[in-house]
């Protein structure tokens, strides 16, 4: 979303997103890689016998850890090997997802009638924005570093709480103007 904020007025100029693109998509890239690695273990466990929830949990842990580390050891219960995934390897596995994240940025910018140079501040929203590749893509697109002082998973809740406060008359001095 692109907002104009001034003197207590929050005006939404444009909003765009891909509801079919989320953290689960990134997780499945690691799961697919992991299945290939497990299948390559000599005398290993059959991949079909590993519950999907176990693989997804391992993938999610790896994804989160790769946001702050260059490599992560992935351990799957009942598999006698540890699999190491590198951040650059994960980014290559999910390069198309990163490209897909760019399209809503371009659309919102176009809908708002703005160029990236006209954006003063970039606030990231959602857990996937913790990934360095996503942050780098946004920085390259907007020409400035995203704010790092706001938790990307809490920012939506804070906005919703502010809007609820305004609607309930519990918050004054703030005007929210949605996109028309």
Q: How would you name each of these model-derived features?
A:
Residues 1-180:
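Oxyanion-binding/catalytic loops of NTP- or PPi-dependent enzymes
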